[in-house]
């Protein structure tokens, strides 16, 4: 798994952005929750798309990261030197 492999890196990405169905990875039922919590603790900023969270009715289930607007996600992507998408 790519996300699990990130914890083996010395230098982490500045941001991980979760959109669409990927927002489910940030919920309590996700098997990746401990990995994401560790990435966040190590300094990786986790951003979760507010629109996706609302569309999937997961408002009260997000347990890691910060729920942000689509506009802010777009700003992050436009200001980044590199964007890798999975």
PLM regions with names:
Residues 1-29:
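Conserved mixed alpha/beta catalytic, RNA-binding, or beta-rich assembly cores of soluble enzyme
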Residues 24-29, 55-62:
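Glycine-rich, charge-decorated loop segments at or immediately adjacent to ligand/cofactor-binding or catalytic sites
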Residues 75-85:
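C-terminal binding/interaction regions
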Residues 3, 33-37, 74:
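Short amphipathic alpha-helical segments and helix-helix/interface helices
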């Amino acid at each position: 798994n790519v996300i699990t492999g990130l914890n083996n890196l010395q230098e982490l990405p500045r941001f991980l952005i979760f959109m669409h169905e990927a927002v489910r990875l940030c919920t309590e039922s996700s098997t990746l929750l401990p990995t994401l919590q560790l990435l966040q603790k190590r300094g990786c900023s986790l951003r979760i798309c507010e629109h996706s969270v609302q569309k999937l009715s997961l408002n009260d289930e997000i347990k890691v990261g910060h729920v942000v607007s689509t506009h802010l996600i777009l700003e992050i992507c436009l200001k980044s030197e590199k964007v890798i998408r999975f």
